[in-house]
Amino acid sequence: MSRVCQVTGKRPVTGNNRSHALNATKRRFLPNLHSHRFWVEGEKRFVTLRVSAKGMRVIDKKGIEAVLADLRARGEKY
């Protein structure tokens, strides 16, 4: 399973570790992803999404129904 937020599209980015001597070694910054069950009142069922912490805030703001409508419009499965 890829490390991509289903709501915001956040994905890993690359950067450098920097030691005290400023030596650079490659590393990945991973999004703060969680599998979370959301209750969809209109469908009377739970939906499990892999979302970042920001994605959960978006769902709190817009509502799960609106977010699922956006996912359907993009053709994503959930």
Swiss-Prot record:
UniProt KW Transport keyword: no
Disulfide bond positions: none
Family matches, as InterPro entries: Ribosomal_bL28, Ribosomal_bL28/bL31-like_sf, Ribosomal_bL28_bact-type, Ribosomal_bL28_sf
One CC-aspect GO term: cytosolic large ribosomal subunit
GO biological process, one term: translation
Pfam families on file: Ribosomal_L28
Keywords for the protein's UniProt record, in alphabetical order: Ribonucleoprotein, Ribosomal protein
Membrane-spanning intervals of the chain: none
KW Thylakoid (keyword) present: no
Single Gene Ontology MF annotation: structural constituent of ribosome
NCBIfam families on file: L28
Family: Belongs to the bacterial ribosomal protein bL28 family.
UniProt name for this protein: Large ribosomal subunit protein bL28
Organism of derivation: Edwardsiella ictaluri (strain 93-146)
Taxonomic lineage from the root: Bacteria, Pseudomonadati, Pseudomonadota, Gammaproteobacteria, Enterobacterales
Primary gene name: rpmB
